[in-house]
A protein has these predicted regions:
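Bacterial N-terminal signal peptides that target proteins for export
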Residues: 1-14
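C-terminal segment of classical bacterial N-terminal signal peptides
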Residues: 15-25
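Low-complexity, acidic/polar, glycine-enriched regions of mature
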Residues: 24-193
């Protein structure tokens, strides 16, 4: 009887401890695709152009109390790139630009998310990670702003890149006089509880 009572107490204690540990691990946040956007901003003939990626998925595991444990990943469907013109949209999918047939996805995986120095707690972070476009991977670093919105959170950021680092624009399109080398990938990701 004493053995049974001790075993039952130990089992209940173990289940309770497992429940506490499980609840302490942040669950991935649910991304609201209808409210979230990813776009690329660049200059063509010195005129600003913004194009949207209409299809992407994001995996975010984030707790503002433990930013060092946070993780983020984004997969972008390259064929969803929209310049607002069907002819241009077809052109950028070709080998000289994105080569979407061979490289249908671009991706980002974070390696570090740290609270930004001097910023109010839980609002600004420094993010580093690996960005892969057209089979080329490069380290990127960018500021991230996080704010509460209802029961969810909003993540905003801008990732500066050079398109030629990723071989975007081959042949005659390597000339940065037509299309600038500097590109900013902007994102606005809304999560729900």
């Amino acid at each position: 009887m004493i053995l049974r009572s001790t075993l039952t107490s130990a089992l209940i204690g173990g289940i309770a401890a497992f429940s506490l540990v499980s609840s302490a691990i942040a669950a991935p946040l649910k991304v609201d695709a209808g409210k979230s956007t990813v776009s690329a901003v660049f200059k063509q003939l010195n005129v600003p152009v913004e194009a949207k990626f209409k299809k992407f998925t994001a995996q975010i595991d984030f707790d503002s109390a433990k930013p060092d444990a946070a993780k983020a990943g984004v997969d972008i469907d390259i064929s969803s790139f929209d310049l607002g013109d069907a002819e241009y949209n077809k052109e950028v999918l070709k080998k000289e630009w994105f080569n979407a047939a061979q490289f249908p996805k671009a991706s980002f995986v974070s390696s570090s998310i740290k609270a930004a120095a001097g910023a109010p707690a839980g609002t600004k972070y420094d993010v580093t990670g690996k960005l892969t476009i057209k089979g080329k991977t490069a380290d990127v670093r960018f500021p991230l702003t996080v704010k509460k919105e209802g029961n969810g959170q909003v993540f905003d950021g801008a990732v500066p890149i050079k398109r030629l680092t990723f071989n975007i624009g081959e042949g005659e399109w390597k000339d940065t006089g037509m299309v600038a080398d500097e590109v900013t990938i902007k994102f606005h990701v809304v999560t729900a509880p």
